Regions:
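Positively charged, small/polar-rich N-terminal and surface patches that mediate targeting and assembly
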Residues: 1-95
Length: 95
C-alpha cells in the first residue's frame, strides 16, 4: 500500500555540534537519492527532550516502508542521533 512517510531529522548532534549543510547534502546524495525516486525536504524547528533544534522533514511517497526505516536508521548512524521520528499518512495521488 502506498503511503506518505515523513522523517523528522534533527540537525544537532548529541555533543551540540550542528550538522552542516554539506554533511546533510552528502546524506541526501548517498542515501535518499539511492533509495527513492523522489522526495521533498522542508525546514522546521523541532523540540527533543526540551531542547529546540533545526530540523529537516523528508517526505516520501512509497509503498516500501522498509526503505524509509533504512534511511532513518542510516541517519541515526551517520549523525549519532538518539531517534528519528517517522509519521505515516495516506498517500497523495500522483496524476
Amino acid at each position: 500500500m502506498m503511503n506518505t512517510y515523513q522523517m523528522y531529522l534533527g540537525l544537532t548532534r548529541p555533543d551540540n555540534e550542528t550538522i552542516t549543510t554539506e554533511q546533510f547534502n552528502a546524506y541526501t546524495k548517498e542515501v535518499l537519492d539511492t533509495l527513492f525516486d523522489g522526495y521533498t525536504i522542508s525546514d522546521a524547528v523541532g523540540n527533543w527532550k526540551g531542547e529546540r533544534e533545526q530540523t529537516k522533514i523528508v517526505s516520501v511517497c512509497t509503498e516500501y516502508k522498509n526503505l524509509v526505516q533504512k534511511a532513518a536508521n542510516l541517519y541515526k548512524e551517520f549523525f549519532e542521533q538518539d531517534a528519528v521520528a517517522i509519521s505515516t499518512l495516506p498517500a497523495l495521488e500522483l496524476v
